[in-house]
Amino acid sequence: MSNFQRRDFLTGAAAFAAATTATLVGTRRAVADDKPPQPIRGKEGAPIIDPTNPTREAQNVDRLVPPSTDHGTMPNLRFSFADVHNRLQPGGWARQVTGRELQVAQALNCVNMRLKAGAVREMHWHVPDEWGFVLKGRMRITAVDGEGHAFQDDISEGNIWNFPGGIPHSLQGLEGDGCEFLLVFNDGNFNEDATFLVTDFLAHIPKEVLAKNFGVPESAFANIPKEELYIFESQVPGPLDADRVVGAGPVPSTYSHKLMDQKPIETNGGRVRIVDSSNFPAAKMIAAALVEV
């Protein structure tokens, strides 16, 4: 890019940023003055007569008053967790946005989940990979691969994990207020309510088969749940070292990554941390960037 082109680009970008900021500030001021935004841009548009939802319209100004550069049919590029059904369970909840709610999200599915201290998202597995980001609190993640390698780790706000598809795993909130986190699956049509759960699996296997497999009497399975638990309350676990299971040894690649310990790329406008399979080998299907502006 020549100096002239670069100068023009920077000047245009600055003007665009200033105009965008002015629009947002004006909208906030209008809402604060009990003057809801209207679908008017210069000589185009007209005031809303009815129906109207000023609060929602103020949150979606670029949909109500789209930029003049928009052209043709514009798909919805965002969807709020506040608008989806929430699954309430003893010890927590879960809500998801999939390709059903957000049509452009055919490659990714997102779940927002909350676990109280001690509460467990029971051991389960599914076809797509699971990439997780801790929003608040602390949690313990546990998994075992097909070779019997066991994995346990305690992670906190800003940390991430990735379980490859088919790997059985569980999640548990730790002391304090438990945890809240975001899950991402590399399948937009994946359904969090349709995972394979260990309680559901055990409930549909004859007890004599379970007894022979685990080498215990059938009576050991007399009180197993008759249906899935999904999320259930439990006690806060003890220290991580005391909870570790040796199994066949550690997994080949760790399933957790301390993202906030990663040195960020610093710029004049903020910083960014990028995580992909080059610095987190377990995350072969999903890459991400944490951007601070």
Give the predicted meaning of each segment.
Residues 122, 131-133, 158:
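Mobile, glycine-rich extracellular loop/lid and propeptide segments
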Residues 31-107, 210-292:
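A short, N-terminal "cap"/entry segment at the start of jelly-roll beta-barrel domains
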Residues 1-17:
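N-terminal secretory signal peptides and thylakoid transit peptides that target proteins
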Residues 111, 120-121, 137-143, 288:
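Short beta-strand segments in beta-sandwich/barrel cores
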Residues 165-192:
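Ligand-binding loop in jelly-roll beta-barrel domains
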Residues 127-146:
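Glycine- and acidic-residue-biased ligand/ion/polar-headgroup-sensing regions
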Residues 146-162:
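Short acidic-glycine-tyrosine-enriched beta hairpin
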Residues 119-122, 140, 160-161, 165-170:
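Histidine-centered metal-chelating micro-motifs
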